[in-house]
Amino acid sequence: MTVFIGIYKAIYNYEPQTPDELTIQEDDLLYLLEKSNVDDWWTVKKRVIGSDIDEPAGLVPSNYVEVADVISQVKAVYDYHEVQNPDEELVFNENDTFDVYDDKDPDWILARSISTNQFGFIPGNYVEPLNAETGSAVPPSQPAAAAALPPPIATSATSPPAPALTAIDISTLPPPPQHSSKTNAQASDSGNRDYADKDLPDLPPNKPSRSNTETNEDDYYDAPPTKPARPNSTSNEQDTRQKARSRTSYYDQHYEDDAEDYRSSQRDDDYNDSEPSGELRTWNVAEIEGRKKRKAKLSIGNNRLFFSPQKGSPQDWSVDKLISYDNEKKHLFLEFVDPYKSLELHTGDNDTCKEILSVIGEIKGASRDPGFKEVEMASKSKKKGNVLYDFTAESNDELTIKQGQVVYIINDQKSKDWWLCELIDSGKRGVVPSHFIEPIQEKLTSSHTGGLFKSIKKFAKGGKSSKASDDAYSGSWEDDGMEGSTERRSRSGSYSTRKRASSTTSKKELPNPKKSRIWEDRSGTFKVEAQFIGCKEGKVHLHKANGVKIAVAAEKLSDDDLVYVERVTGFSLDKYKVRGSGTSSSRQDPRESERERRRRLRENDEKDRDRRLRERELNELQKARQLLDNERTKLQEQNEQPPSKPPRPSSGMGNRSRSQSTKDNYDWFEFFLNSGVDVSSCQRYTSNFEKERITEDMMVDINDSILRTLGLREGDIVRVMKYLDKKLGRDVSPQTAVVAGGMFSEADGSLKNNNSENQSSVGQQLLPNNPDLVSNTPIDDDTWTVRPAAKSEATLAPKTAEFTGSMQDLLDLKPLEPKKTEQLPIANLAVTESVVPEPNLKNLEPVRTGNVVQKPLANTLTGGATLVPLDPFKTGGNNVLPVTTGFVMMPFATGGAMPIQRTGGIIVPQTTFGTNAAGGIMPAQITGGLIPVATTGGLMPQTSFGVTPVANVVPLQRTGGAVMPIATTGGANILPQTTFNLPPSGTVLPIQRTANGLMAANTTGGMMPLNTTGGMMPLNTTGGMIPLNTTGGMMPMNTTGGVMSLQRTGGMMPQTSFGTQQMTGGAMNMMPQISFGAQQMTGGAMNVFPQTSFGAQQMTGGAMQNPNMGTMQNPNMGVMQNPNMGAFQPKSQFGMTLQRTGGAMAQPIMDAGVTGIAQGVQNMSMAQPLQNQPTGFGFGNGPQQPVQANIYNASASNPFGF
């Protein structure tokens, strides 16, 4: 259902007297929105053609309008149910008929539905005109339409004057409201309320009486609760109407920026100089276009200028859009932009033109200067609030505020969570959270601007009713007339609802201090400060400083006050002035009064000019003060930065400037480029140097450690240090670097010697004296591992201090002195040291392969319980271990089970099958001297013919003795396993020569050999794959009577690493352990067998793995430990068996009937010397190599001393 009650047209022109009234012209189409039940003022909206033009709404006298004529009829051809704006559009079905009132807009036709009797708009393309028969019935439809609207017809019937009133004197009638010369307040002042219902036939009717009490715009639409939102809810109407057409109310365009403020403060009076909330000011002007003048209105308020022409759409601009303003007498010239408009207005008199210019100058200056704005706001009674917390705006409609600020609360009713506030200094508006603002009580802001508003406190607390406000008319003047009070009371009683709302609003209103003046009665007894409102019916209406409005009889005022009223209104009040008693004086009174009036006008003008000058000076002072305050505030903000804020841009600029200055001091990128560093690394190094703020003067202190800390790579460190030495001119001559070595290495990469100081040095007689061989020997520095820098030994000569970091250095150093259980006598040490033989230089051609001078290892006794250390050796690939080629007595066990030794033939050394050799030459066992041959009772040992050995060259070992003793191992004698005619695979294996031609060889491939001795002989798994203990399958079986200790033979033997020294004598009988640098004991009191971790198979059958079960594996008991378990067992030059820790582990042979002669020590020096053996790559039956091995010349790069 639409909001239109009817369609009317204006029959007279009407000029509004108050802002809530509507300007209408004759024949204007009007939509009736509401009829008043208490007076004859109706709320209508004017029909305006065009989608972009707003349709104004307001009040008009009911006797100025009549029902519009129906111009045609149409019929619906489609159903129309989906309306876009139900407040203005009609819902209809097909074949419905309509009365058309206006079809000037082809898209939307203004019509009335005959079926539902509703008024509104229908789409033009949904209807079609009726046929001729229907069209002929159009004129009679007008009475039908009038009959359908009884209230408008009844009203119009009562409005026309009776014919009997034609005899009334025309001079007594008030002028018509549309008179052009009566645009000011006197047009309504002279209107007699007694003639509201009477009029002459040839004159337009008077507008109905209206109340003097303020009428709020909301009052006209709050009465009927069932109706939709009225034009006071401009935003709601605008939102709904703009969906279909841009038809909004008249006041939406004028006050859309401050509608709430205007509605809460506008007053209902009949004078053009009334100012709602002391802010909006309106003047009736005439727009001049060429030679034509058109009536218009100019309104200024809320920092906006509103121009409403009589014909045409109203326009408004903000103050900043006004680019120029000037006047020439009564003509006012304004020029706007966005949109551009140049106006020439005629104000009617010079005073009005000056007043308009003054107001424009004030708001223009206020928009440019916040200080003036603050002064202007101080003269208003706006609700203020204190800001409790800081709030930063995150959207365009929000307002940024700081704690401690005072803001104006513009609207706190629309939303309880968000309030519309305005900054006092800048005038910027926006919404802020309501809980961020604490409203200030009215009493705190009611006494500003001196003593002008002293009485507002009492007025604000009074809570007076409208009746008390009416009684105040006689508060300051004894004889104030109250003509028309009966009529006022009757009107106030007829619409008490609106009066209550108006009285509530009036309590908050105060007069404009700029228009307030001192009024004095004729006797000089009473004075009051008030603002002139208007003059009507011989009464002067004033607005006192306390907010009370009074009406004073004109004859009670002084002549000065009457002259002021005449100047403002333009009416003559001479009849109310004091006149002389004489006839001559009475004839001269008009001239004298005119002179007096002009004199007073001049005085008033001068006073006003002086007042404006003072106000301008005050504004300039406050502007300067505000500027100083702003500068002071900025300085304080810069000096007192809150700690929670991020660093100021000045700090960031300082950091960048310092960083830039550092960059400017020295170009590290160029430095690294000149040093030879790769370009991809120069930037990273440069960034690291700049982060650490390394400057050019710090180059002298840069060393390897600093560069390494700064992230430089090793190669780049060398380049940078060389460049620094060259740049700084430092001495780069070779010097012995005094640097600390590693934990186990020296400065040149060799292993440290941790033996005691009493170790003897290598005898000079054992060193080669051929300088050519030494000098021509190539040196390969990359043979072994990387050599870290370390501190060199002070005891070594510079010639012998160059180590290569190889495993050979272990043989060149003294072994650690173990913790001995018995102290060996010095005499015995001397005896053993004297046993060292001289090398046979005939068969040996020593070759120096390095600059390292070997120190002889100390000999240890093999008898008793003395712990004998085992020389360390490297257990990886590329192991070239020296062997003794001299005459060395080999100890052997005479009782119990003896381990199987290689004794001759084309001997394939035992290789570490199952383990990956890292390459190089595998050292061979020393088999010289008296090598015991195990008699196996006639059983031939299993040979390893056709078994492929490890793909490395194993040097041929030649045994020196002529007679090889045969060791009886209890029971049957077992012949050693031989490898005669074994085809080597992958490399050339040296052949061991034996003295007696009978060498036992261990099988290195095929099935595992079975020891069939009567004693306890272990099954040695020397084959290619990992040996398996035959505990039911192919596991070695102990055929001895005692309990045999099952050894772990599967997997890999634990590999020893650098610095490992193995003890093979003494009470300890430990197998070597795995970790690097550990000192391993292979003999001793504890028979701890190390556990291997690479593919080992644990013996789970037979006896326990503990060697101590059954028979102790103590070397004192004559039990020999077989070192030849799948790996080649090297021999040391001091007669001790070097235990190979790779491959399968050996099983100790246990026998209860052994003697403790041998002590488990192999290769002890015996009476028979060992012969030098060929160490080349040929076999034993081939020609001798020209170069022979010399263990005393062995080094890291030449382990055999070629």
UniProtKB/Swiss-Prot annotation:
Component of the PAN1 actin cytoskeleton-regulatory complex. Residues 191-201, 253-269, 506-518, 588-609, 622-637 have a biased composition (Basic and acidic residues). Residues 133-278, 462-518, 577-609, 622-661, 749-770 are annotated as: Disordered. InterPro entries: PH_SLA1, SAM/pointed_sf, SH3-like_dom_sf, SH3_domain, SHD1, Sla1_SH3_1, Sla1_SH3_3. Keywords: Actin-binding, Cell membrane, Cytoplasm, Cytoskeleton, Endocytosis, Endosome, Membrane, Repeat, SH3 domain. GO terms for biological process: actin cortical patch assembly; cell wall organization; endocytosis; negative regulation of Arp2/3 complex-mediated actin nucleation; regulation of actin filament polymerization. Residues 136-167 have a biased composition (Low complexity). PANTHER family: ACTIN CYTOSKELETON-REGULATORY COMPLEX PROTEIN SLA1, FCH AND DOUBLE SH3 DOMAINS PROTEIN. Component of the PAN1 actin cytoskeleton-regulatory complex required for the internalization of endosomes during actin-coupled endocytosis. The complex links the site of endocytosis to the cell membrane-associated actin cytoskeleton. Mediates uptake of external molecules and vacuolar degradation of plasma membrane proteins. Plays a role in the proper organization of the cell membrane-associated actin cytoskeleton and promotes its destabilization. It is found in: Cell membrane; Endosome membrane; Cytoplasm, Cytoskeleton, Actin patch. It comes from the Eukaryota. Signal peptide: none annotated. GO terms for molecular function: actin binding; cargo adaptor activity; identical protein binding; ubiquitin binding. This is Actin cytoskeleton-regulatory complex protein SLA1. Residues 3-70, 71-132, 380-442 form the SH3 domain. The gene is SLA1. It is a peripheral membrane protein. Residues 179-190, 652-661, 751-770 have a biased composition (Polar residues). Belongs to the SLA1 family.
